[in-house]
UniProtKB/Swiss-Prot annotation:
InterPro entries linked to this entry: Restrct_endonuc-II-like, tRNA_endonuc-like_dom_sf, UPF0102_YraN-like
Name of this protein: UPF0102 protein Hac_0727
Family listed: Belongs to the UPF0102 family.
Molecular function (Gene Ontology), one example: nucleic acid binding
Gene3D superfamilies reported in the protein's UniProt record: 3.40.1350.10
Record Pfam families: UPF0102
Length: 114
């Protein structure tokens, strides 16, 4: 188990808050933040044009944050999505996205599983 100090947690929360604001400018409706299950966590769940977007937010300054989304992390995200949909609407169209925050800039990578 990894432990993070408060500074790291605050930085992550700030990045997620800024990410939500950025997503809203792109027409996303934020449905939920930090959804937890026994399988893992989804940073942001958003809705746009009839599709649920499960968004993993990664930030970094000295490395490319996309590399923090490992196959193991992606598997946990998928299990958490399955749980979420089983509780809400199993027939929803969805995709998994990554929102990369680096040096104050945002890059949305849609459908990262394909």
């Amino acid at each position: 188990m990894r432990f993070f100090n408060n500074k790291h947690k605050e930085k992550g929360l700030k990045a997620e808050e800024e990410a939500c604001e950025f997503l809203k400018t792109l027409g996303f409706e934020i449905i939920e933040r930090n959804f937890f299950s026994k399988f893992g966590e989804i940073d942001i769940i958003a809705f746009k044009k009839g599709v649920l977007h499960f968004i993993e937010v990664k930030s970094g300054e000295n490395f490319d944050p996309i590399y923090a989304i490992t196959p193991s992390k992606l598997q946990k995200i998928i299990q958490t999505i399955r749980y979420y949909l089983s509780q809400k609407d199993p027939n929803s169209d969805f995709c998994i996205d990554a929102l990369i925050v680096k040096n104050g800039k945002f890059e949305l990578l849609e459908n990262i599983t394909f």
